[in-house]
Amino acid sequence: MKRIVCWTFILTSAGFAQQMAVQRPKITGIDHVDFYTSNEQANNHLYAEVLGLPSALPLETGQLQRFVIGKQWVGYSAAPDAKATNRMDHVAFSTEDCDALRVYLAAHGVKVRESAGRSKEGRSFRVNDPEGNVIEFVQPSGAIRAKPSGQGEALRARPDPVSRRLIHTGFIVRDRAAEDHFYKDILGFRLYWHGGMKDGQTDWAAMQVPDGTDWLEYMLNIDANPDLQTTGVMNHISLGVRDMKEAVAKMEAHGWKPHDKDDHSEIGKDGKWQFDVFDPDFTRVELMEFTPTQKPCCSDFQGPHPSEK
């Protein structure tokens, strides 16, 4: 019996030592987010015209559209199932070392491929988080980033894009503890802010990347079977702006007009000015000021705020 206990201790200690020996490389921010669309033309109107974002050549298999936000981008592929209620394909984070991160995740029990793949934008690999969301890690290639023509960078651009920074993305989360084990315990994400529609309730938890200011927002307490519109509101991206009045004025100059009285900016529960527009499949594109203008309602910020750089 003592031998069994001894060997169990040795094996457990060896596994723990292996985890400790493999260091996590830096995860610095959001590289891109990819969605599905049923209307390319309407999509192009929103991103290229209203938001003034540069269009770019597709990078991924099956991709139809790509819009550049500074050094980040949002992409769209054709919706494979028009009746599906989720238009988010995957979220990609930037890392300084794709191979090292893959080894690190494997050492912590995450199922990964045997090696990272190569693409036009650098090295990358994908995993599924505990709830099945597709998460990609990208080690961008500086050489490819520096070639605008023919390598996927901006093909055309307005001189006055509404935003040059993608500051967060969010999606529906059912089991916060399971997601925290993956994002917080293993990957090192940290809580930036949390709040809810009612005092004492957490409906949103902003999990900041460990080595930057971008964050992933858990959208909590959502109905078990949300429709396309609800899912579109929850599975979203957020573009950072310095001044919301200036951002809305730019959109109006680009031809945007409010549809109803609810089309206006407002201060969110986190104390930041926010404004929402939607793609043709109801996916929300949130504009958000980088810093709060008033104290948040539910909790203090626990991490640094993003900026345009």
Placement of each model-derived feature along the sequence:
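Vicinal oxygen chelate
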Residues: 18-26, 28-39, 65-68, 80-165, 170-171, 193-196, ...
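Short, charged/polar, Gly/Pro-enriched secondary-structure boundary elements
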Residues: 72-76, 83-85, 132-135, 212-216, ...
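Core segments of cupin and vicinal oxygen chelate
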Residues: 25, 31-74, 107, 123-126, ...
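Structured core of small recognition/catalytic domains
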Residues: 177-266
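Sec-dependent N-terminal signal peptides
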Residues: 4-13
